[in-house]
């Protein structure tokens, strides 16, 4: 009887210990993630040479902080015009990539989930298998293919190779599996076409999945630097990440524009997250559990 009474107390004690450990680990991770962002943010209000000499830290001297870096960023001089040209290129490329990737991956996942056909499982296996292949292995064949198609130095050359993302297809497939198949039959009875069912009935239901993937796709496209650097040749087509990298030269570095421009470059992703954050958790949890 004493053992039975002591068992719940032991389980409760273990649960408290686990809760404290997990909370502490989470707090440490938050500090590690937040430190570079906070240090970079405060560094953007300091002289670039001072940041390079002393390094970025949270040991701040507010008397030396100023807005000169951001004034230079918005001054309209040659460096400022280049920066916002790269900024515009990144915005356009990210918008096109997100829209096309979501639509293509949704229809692929929808077809793999809602219809039965030969080699269905094998095709899905091939999709998942590509997740195990590092991009660096595919980079040279993709570059040769883009060159042979004549789309080098174009946005199409950057967008098309990554249009059918395996992880995005997998997420959409897991989400659509949780949707009731009776909706398809109801749509067919009402005379709706297969395309109409997928667009007018099923697509609105998958709004949380679209929002979740929009955030992840936007982050991936906005931060992508390696592949656009290989494809683009003209500086007028550079994205923000490539353009900022050109500010680092053996002959001198424009740290004022680099630091302030890096901080200002976070803004689009932050706005996208704030817009779609309420759908993010719903999309992740609904897609992870088949109802």
What positions do the PLM features span?
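A structural signal for multi-pass alpha-helical bundles of membrane permease subunits
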Residues: 8-291
């Amino acid at each position: 009887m004493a053992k039975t009474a002591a068992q719940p107390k032991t389980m409760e004690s273990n649960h408290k210990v686990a809760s404290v450990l997990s909370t502490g680990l989470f707090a440490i991770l938050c500090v590690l993630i937040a430190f570079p962002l906070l240090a970079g943010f405060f560094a953007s209000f300091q002289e670039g040479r001072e940041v390079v000499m002393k390094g970025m830290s949270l040991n701040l001297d507010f008397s030396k902080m100023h807005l000169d870096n951001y004034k230079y960023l918005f001054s309209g001089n040659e460096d400022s015009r280049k920066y916002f040209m790269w900024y515009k290129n990144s915005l356009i490329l990210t918008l096109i990539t997100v829209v096309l990737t979501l639509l293509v991956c949704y229809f692929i996942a929808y077809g793999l989930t809602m219809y039965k056909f030969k080699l269905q499982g094998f095709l899905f296996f091939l999709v998942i298998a590509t997740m195990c292949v590092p991009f660096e292995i595919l980079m040279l064949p993709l570059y040769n293919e883009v060159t042979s198609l004549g789309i080098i130095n174009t946005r199409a050359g950057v967008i098309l190779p990554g249009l059918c993302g395996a992880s995005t297809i997998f997420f959409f497939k897991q989400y659509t599996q949780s949707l009731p198949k009776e909706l398809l039959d109801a749509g067919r009875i009402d005379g709706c076409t297969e395309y109409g069912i997928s667009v007018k009935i099923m697509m609105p239901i998958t709004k949380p999945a679209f929002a979740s993937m929009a955030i992840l796709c936007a982050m991936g496209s906005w931060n992508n630097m390696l592949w656009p650097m290989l494809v683009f040749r003209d500086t007028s087509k550079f994205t923000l990440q490539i353009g900022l990298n050109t500010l680092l030269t053996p002959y001198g570095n424009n740290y004022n524009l680099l630091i302030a421009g890096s901080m200002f470059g976070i803004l689009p992703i932050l706005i996208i997250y704030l817009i779609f954050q309420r759908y993010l958790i719903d999309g992740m949890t609904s897609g992870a559990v088949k109802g």
